[in-house]
Amino acid sequence: MTTTAQVREAFMPLVARHSDLVLIGRFLIVRPVHHILRGVFVDRSSDKRSFEPHIVTYPLVPAQETVMLGWNPVWLYDQSVGMWDVTKPDTITAIRHHIEAIALPPLRAIKTFDDYIAHERAKSTTFYGHFDDRVFTNILVAAALGDFSKALQLRPQDERIERYFAKFAPDFFPALESGNREFIANTLHQWEAATVKAFKMEHIWKPTPFPLEI
């Protein structure tokens, strides 16, 4: 498996070339970070010489403790290159160019929740299904957008969601039902801050109002 030091050696040249990139551990993140985390997560592989980079996008809510690939990550692969071999300089150069050409343009285009939704809906549904079926995420996105009716309409679709909110945010759905925008906004901000702290991203996070507050 590749090491974090090898990831840093391979991808810091990208950070040097692009002022909106920062590397935190294995995560090459596009700045600014507001509500949506955008980047390339350079995962380990069963082969000690190989990187497995994925395009990753997901909201900072709910509160998360560890970096994850999120829903339906896009594996960056170039058939003409094959395995991203850390021991081959030409391969490392190729992966940098691949990220610049394939990953960065769509990631940079995601600036709002609507952009995020469009990005997720455009992904292949072969292995993970359609984004609109991701009930939990869509409840939170609808709440962030201020569409409380949609968030409440999605609520009955999954009993696991009821258990989650009963444990971590029992007042969330009652606040949606009463139209308490201040409570929902404060809850989302607290979750974002917790995720940012866990991911050690305080220095690149730009706290901003949610659409429901504007």
Please report, for each region that a protein language model flagged, where it lies by residue.
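Amphipathic alpha-helical segments
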Residues: T3-V22
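Long, charged, glycine-rich C-terminal linkers/tails
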Residues: G25-V30
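Intrinsically disordered, low-complexity regulatory regions enriched in serine/threonine/proline
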Residues: V33-I214
